Amino acid sequence: MSSARDSQAQHGLKRAASPDGSGSWQAADLGNEERKQKFLRLMGAGKKEHTGRLVIGDHRSTSHFRTGEEDKKMNEELESQYQQSMDSTMSGRNRRHCGLGFSEFQEVEEEAAGHSSDHESSEDSESGSDSEQDESAEELQAAEKHDEAAVPENKKEAKSNYKMMFVKASGS
């Protein structure tokens, strides 16, 4: 108990809150009224008063209004930018962002299929007799069977190449 009395004597007694409210920021004497208002405003205790200034965007001379022509021009520019980005996305010029499932081999197959159909139609138009058409059709079927037999090997090679490229890229 003596230790509690010693510590109380060293630090002194706590004061009770003043009943008259002298601890209030409003009662602080800072000189003139202007300094008092500034102090209260900085402490977050003062009420903000309207200073007579315009609110941003209120005055027509300071705000920037667009005319109808400017709106149309801006919309056309935005539309053209959008179309350019969509065209580049759809045409596939930007191959960096293809993702993990992308394979160049699939595109090569599609192009080859497109060329073979073009080639087939040109042969049909050139040949005049039925026998020539039958022979060309048989040749095309044989070539397609040969292509089908080669495709699984190519797919396996493409997959292994793709995996190796992926492993190399992730390892570095």
Curated annotation (Swiss-Prot):
Expressed in otocyst. Residues 46-76, 112-122, 142-160 have a biased composition (Basic and acidic residues). Residues 1-10, 80-92 have a biased composition (Polar residues). Residues 1-172 are annotated as: Disordered. Residues 123-138 have a biased composition (Acidic residues). It comes from the Eukaryota. Belongs to the SMAP family. PANTHER family: SMALL ACIDIC PROTEIN (PTHR22175:SF0), SMALL ACIDIC PROTEIN-RELATED (PTHR22175). This is Small acidic protein.
